[in-house]
Regions:
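Bacterial N-terminal signal peptides that target proteins for export
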Residues: 1-8
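Hydrophobic h-region of N-terminal signal peptides that target proteins for export
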Residues: 11-19
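N-terminal, motif-rich segments that launch catalysis or mediate targeting to/interaction with membranes
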Residues: 18-128, 135-253
Length: 253
């Protein structure tokens, strides 16, 4: 009973994320590519704690993002002027990447944890490794989202990088992302997956700061903009996939 209460408390705690990164298709694509790069042993061990494929849980946290009771987790990753993760935020809030690192640390001892807590932390890792690579989920000093019109569709500039640009470029299903993007050699995949969540966030912050240089005063973006920019979120998606696989293989493989 105590473990169940802890699980439910943790679930409500993680429900604090008020805005999603990527959308379901992109989250599913990241998880599916990661799953296809898991070792057999990692797959077997993970299956002990999850009832379905990791794809099933890829966007679970977004379902709870509007829950008002808990606001202690930030849904974006704050960085400072040097593109470094800001660990301590205002009013006691916690950077979600910091909590991700805590979840990974806890899972290193998963054999001595209750099944429900392993499941919760595993679901958290699956979601946030994807989230942290989304171009619009790095919060830079002085940068704001604003409104946007992409090929006649009204949305936020934030949402353009969650899904708008990639939808405009491809319109692929999550399985098509795997078929068409998971084409790197074993050595290339290992190179992309090197590092830690803190280092990955720094790389993401450096790579994705340019989206605010691309922001237009009139908020209007067309097909040429998509053509010129889609490789950035596409690259972030594949990095997230291989890094998620690396984390899970390291923990459960």
């Amino acid at each position: 009973m105590k473990n169940l209460k802890l699980f439910l408390l943790g679930l409500m705690l993680c429900a604090a994320l008020p805005s999603q990164a990527w959308d379901r298709t992109r989250h599913d694509a990241i998880a599916y590519i990661a799953e296809c790069n898991l070792t057999p042993r990692a797959k077997r061990n993970i299956a002990r704690y999850l009832d379905h494929s990791i794809v099933y849980y890829a966007s679970w946290m977004d379902k709870y993002r509007d829950t008002p009771e808990f606001r202690n987790l930030e849904h974006v990753s704050y960085v400072d002027a040097d593109m470094q993760l800001v660990d301590t935020l205002r009013k006691g809030k916690t950077n979600c990447v910091v909590e991700l690192m805590h979840a990974i640390d806890r899972l290193k001892d998963y054999r001595n944890m209750s099944d429900s807590l392993v499941r919760l932390n595993l679901m958290y890792v699956i979601h946030i490794v994807g989230d942290m690579h989304c171009p619009s989920h790095v919060k830079y000093p002085g940068c704001k989202s604003g409104r946007a019109d992409l090929n006649g569709k009204k949305m936020s500039y934030h949402a353009m990088w969650d899904w708008g640009v990639l939808d405009g470029a491809h319109g692929w299903s999550y399985s098509e992302y795997r078929l068409l993007l998971d084409t790197f050699s074993k050595r290339e995949k290992a190179g992309m997956a090197k590092g830690t969540p803190r280092e990955w966030l720094y790389e993401t912050a450096v790579a994705c700061r340019v989206i605010y240089d691309w922001q237009r005063a009139d908020g209007t973006y067309g097909k040429q903009f998509v053509t010129d920019t889609y490789l950035l979120p596409e690259r972030q998606l594949i990095l997230a996939s291989y890094r998620l696989a690396a984390v899970l293989n390291d923990l459960f493989g």
